[in-house]
UniProtKB/Swiss-Prot annotation:
GO annotation, cellular component aspect: Cul2-RING ubiquitin ligase complex; cytoplasm
Signal peptide: none
PANTHER family documented for this protein: PRAME FAMILY MEMBER 11-RELATED, SIMILAR TO PREFERENTIALLY EXPRESSED ANTIGEN IN MELANOMA-LIKE 3
Protein family: Belongs to the PRAME family.
GO annotation (BP), single: proteasome-mediated ubiquitin-dependent protein catabolic process
LRR repeat residue intervals: 97-124, 179-203, 204-230, 231-266, 267-292, 293-324, 325-345, 349-376, 377-401
InterPro entries with a match to the protein in the record: LRR_dom_sf, PRAME, PRAME_domain
Source organism phylogeny: Eukaryota, Metazoa, Chordata, Craniata, Vertebrata
Recorded superkingdom: Eukaryota
Single annotated GO MF: ubiquitin-like ligase-substrate adaptor activity
Organism: Homo sapiens (Human)
Key words, A-Z: Leucine-rich repeat, Repeat
Protein name per the record: PRAME family member 5
């Protein structure tokens, strides 16, 4: 039988304040700072709307991290917070202890509320003050508005959720009194007319990360393109499932791609570029690469169709010389010369830490072209080569070239062709012997930190089986 710790006197006093329907600002002016966070949480969860309005106006910190609290279904309480902010923004005289400058609705790992709750329980308010994180300001609008609202936009349904709808309507009516700062924008599915109305409310200069994954065709991309060009502080761009409509002529495609790629001339902070299943890149990668103004740290081009000329342009691009991550998985290279890939690896050898060449269809006759450059990537810590149909001899040769890469922590290689029957199914009677030979070869060469060999995708479940020292049959 557990014994509950009785509430502290301060805690009891604070709760009595919430029960007081006539709670006055003068009372809050004298309330100890350490009582505000736990009492605010209780007022929010109990929907004490009048108390919330007053507590927002007397909030003794520069920042109010509200996102963890609105995960509770309390739209009424959220509206009360906005009403309290209204009073701050419109009244001429502010409360004596007013400090609030930032309403933070970002979905980040935040222990503000937990720290102060534990402090209330244990009386360790000094530790709570020490554990406070510094306030994150928006450099774009410093000092121009009395309040900054940080928000992350995740547009995944046809309509906005009720909290975001409530917030955006409130912001729209007070746009001259506050600054709406969105650093992360994720578009996973919404009619573009709705997206457009939201983008018009946001200061595009503030956006640092954008992810678009909603099966757009080129005509829709053209509507998004002008907004992209205004995101001058964009650091990360992820595009996925962009298709060329069958109604778009080659001439129209070229014009649309040109309009899109020229926007990259304005993105002077871009460091991470990821494109997955983007069909318009075929034959046009040079247009995009020539418009890059910064040295990329991360480049991901996956499950796309590229021409051999696209690979050549990629190897010659000056903006990729400092890459830390290169992911070309799902790019079919079977019938291409890998000399451009060799040149590319030579360029990034001094900085490359992550290399993914899964499912590129690389065969025995192509591997030798990249081995000298690969063996000079001394910073490489992760290398994945699954899904490439190479023989046992070629795999052993590959392993002998990666032996000198001392920073390699994770290595993934395909099961050699000898592991399969003529119809392409894994031969479980032959496979254990091949695995044993491979592991012996690896141990003779070095002591890997983490090395896995993987099968082709199972025709029944679609998954790969990974194995190291033990070979387990597919779970299906």
């Amino acid at each position: 039988m557990s014994i509950r710790t009785p509430p502290r006197l301060l805690e009891l006093a604070g709760r009595s304040l919430l029960r007081d329907q006539a709670l006055a600002m003068s009372t809050l002016e004298e309330l100890p700072t350490e009582l505000f966070p736990p009492l605010f949480m209780e007022a929010f969860s109990r929907r004490r709307c009048e108390a919330l309005k007053l507590m927002v106006q007397a909030w003794p910190f520069r920042r109010l991290p509200l996102r963890p609290l609105i995960k509770m279904p309390c739209l009424e309480a959220f509206q009360a917070v906005l009403d309290g902010l209204d009073a701050l923004l419109t009244q001429g005289v502010h409360p004596r202890r007013w400090k609030l400058q930032v309403l933070d609705l970002q979905d980040v790992c935040e222990n503000f509320w937990m720290v102060w709750s534990e402090a209330m329980a244990h009386g360790c308010f000094l530790n709570a003050k020490r554990n406070k994180k510094p306030v994150q300001d928006c450099p774009r609008m410093r000092g121009q508005q009395p309040l900054t609202v940080f928000v992350e936009l995740w547009l995944k349904n046809r309509t906005l959720d009720e909290y975001l709808t409530c917030l955006l309507l409130w912001v729209k009516q007070r746009k001259d009194l506050l600054h709406l700062c969105c650093k992360k924008l994720k578009i996973l599915g919404m009619p573009f007319r709705n997206i457009r109305s939201i983008l018009k409310m946001v200061n595009l200069d503030c956006i640092q990360e954008v992810e678009v994954n909603c099966k757009w065709v080129l005509p829709i991309l053209t509507q998004f393109t002008p907004y992209l060009g205004h995101m001058r502080n964009l650091q990360k761009l992820v595009l996925s499932h962009m298709d060329v409509s069958r109604y778009v002529s080659p001439e129209q495609k070229k014009e649309i791609v040109t309009q899109f790629t020229t926007q990259f001339l304005k993105l002077c902070c871009l460091q991470k570029l990821s494109m997955n299943s983007v069909s318009f890149l075929e034959g046009h990668l040079d247009q995009l690469l020539s418009c890059l103004k910064t040295s990329l740290k991360v480049l991901t081009i996956t499950n796309c169709v590229l021409l051999e000329s696209d690979l050549k342009h990629l190897s010659q691009c000056p903006s990729i010389s400092q890459l830390k991550t290169l992911d070309l998985s799902g790019i079919r290279l079977t019938n291409y010369s890998l000399v451009p890939l060799q040149i590319l690896l030579e360029k990034v050898a001094a900085t490359l830490e992550y290399l993914d060449l899964d499912d590129c269809g690389i065969i025995d006759s192509q591997v030798n072209a990249i081995l000298p450059a690969l063996s000079r990537c001394f910073e490489l810590n992760t290398f994945s080569f699954c899904g490439n149909p190479i023989s046992m001899a070629t795999l052993e040769n590959l392993l002998s070239h990666t032996i000198i890469l001392k920073n390699l922590c994770v290595e993934l290689y395909p099961a050699p062709r000898e592991s399969y029957d003529a119809d392409g199914t894994l031969c479980w009677s032959r496979f254990p012997q091949i695995r044993a030979e491979l592991m012996k070869r690896v141990r003779d060469l070095r002591h890997p930190k983490r090395i896995l060999f993987c099968t082709d995708c199972c025709p029944d479940c679609g998954n790969r089986s990974f194995y190291d020292l033990e070979a387990d049959q597919c779970c299906c």
